Amino acid sequence: MKKLLGLALVAAVVAGTVNAGERVGDFALIDHQGAIQHMAWYNDHSAVVIMPMTKSQDDAASLKALQETYAEQGVQFFLLNPGLHSDRALVQSEVAALGLDLPVLMDDAQLVTEMLGVSHIDEAVLYDPSSFELLYRGPIADIEASLKEALAGEKFEMVSVASNAPAIEFANLDAHANLSYEKDIAPIIAENCASCHRDGGIAPFAMDSSITVQ
């Protein structure tokens, strides 16, 4: 049931894996405490940083330092559980053991992880929540320069840095490749996204054409 609910909330799957200059697409996931985290709600923030859950103390320390420095400047931080396991209590204990206090997005179906192009366990992403444009993808240790540029209002091409961390195992690639827009995606958008992504809605853009949906 959790995987089905997660799938229903991920309208952004229509975008596929993002490239430089492309929008990430809006999405929503349930976090490890059972709360829905809808990315459109953060469009008043300066930036959003998402990093997969990690057992690396160094990566956790880097993320914590960034949070302590930039959260007060309007940067929202999330951890992402890319289908590693669905036990929320275990996730909570693992996060606490790393000294982190962040919402963990439970991507049981791995759709958001795929859509963001995250393929390694230390591969963080940075995006502009007002435009949903991806600005950085790579190790969390190398993200700060891009974050500073984003906060300064600089315009730049997406920065992509290679990762040497363990790869994320994707169990559902074949199933996701066979998704139908008409049968699988359009009903999700109509039920979960259209009320916000419309003229006058709270989302940053209206889903009123095939281009904006993609």
Residue ranges and their predicted role:
Residues 124, 189-200:
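The canonical Cys-X-X-Cys-His
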Residues 135-141, 201-214:
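Gly/Gly-Pro-rich "capping" loops immediately C-terminal to redox-active cysteine motifs
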Residues 18-40, 58, 182:
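N-terminal "domain-start" segment that seeds a small globular fold
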Residues 129-151:
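Non-catalytic, surface beta->alpha helical segment in thiol-disulfide oxidoreductase systems
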Residues 41-59, 186:
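Short active-site neighborhood of thiol/selenol oxidoreductases, capturing the structured segment around
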Residues 170-187:
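Electrostatic cytochrome c docking/interface patches
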Residues 58-98, 108-114:
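Structural microenvironment flanking redox-active thiols in thiol-disulfide oxidoreductases
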Residues 25, 94-128, 134:
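Short, internal strand/loop/helix patches
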